[in-house]
């Protein structure tokens, strides 16, 4: 295994997150002792064009790579193990492994995984079904409930006529604060914490900007705890982390700028709670058929109750992101983590 295609960008609200994650991974792989032959494949934000990019890595980091016309050429995915067609060179590029470092829409929802299945090439991460299920929070919570993992009380809102009545009934039962969340979005995009009736309309509008279905969810007073898992059949469970906030919630700005948030790895949890988090995380991972990697997030209340929040099948992947930090805490360096993911991708097709 030598030829690796790193795939980044795409038509997603998390496009810039993909660029940051991909840049970190590329830097680490370029300096790896395994001497990889890397192909950098960027997908334009409109998702219409794919390019093989051979320019400076800094252009990817700064999102100027598309302007570097001298170092990009259009490519086209091919089916049946034939890799990609290079339009200018009139030849194919056939990587040993595809490594999609894409977040959110089209990157984590099973879309690009389905394409890779048609291409018949090994790829890093979860398959079509696992990716799609984890991206759809409503279905994820139904599946979790079926195996005994609870989530916060939630209803699904679409643009049906009785939407207002549903909202009023939910708030009457559960009170404020509540959260409005796009059913399919990542990095906390489109999520609003609502504390009064006057904030509902704008929160609903914001959430519907990202998805045609919206979750209305009860606030769980507790600490957000993450658990990283690596593997296919044999699993490596990373250290749990804990997120503490001065105010608000862990939104997009907090996730990537850490304005008032503090992330602690390992999380300062009682041993019984830590064990329970890791057991439920592994149960979800195996039951949902996840492969490669995932970060599974819970809320833990003062009484020690666990509530599933979400599952990220391609969590943020810079060298200082939460998932790599969880693995580093159990002795797996960033470079070793990348190598392991590539090996797992090849193992999955044997």
UniProtKB/Swiss-Prot annotation:
Pfam families: Dala_Dala_lig_C, Dala_Dala_lig_N. Mn(2+) 2 binds at residues 310, 312. GO terms for molecular function: ATP binding; D-alanine-D-alanine ligase activity; metal ion binding. Its main location: membrane. It is found in: Cell membrane. Mn(2+) 1 binds at residues 297, 310. It is an enzyme of class 6 (ligase). It catalyses: D-serine + D-alanine + ATP = D-alanyl-D-serine + ADP + phosphate + H(+). There is about a 400-fold difference in catalytic efficiency of VanC2 for using D-serine over D-alanine. This is Vancomycin C-type resistance protein VanC2. It comes from Enterococcus casseliflavus (Enterococcus flavescens).
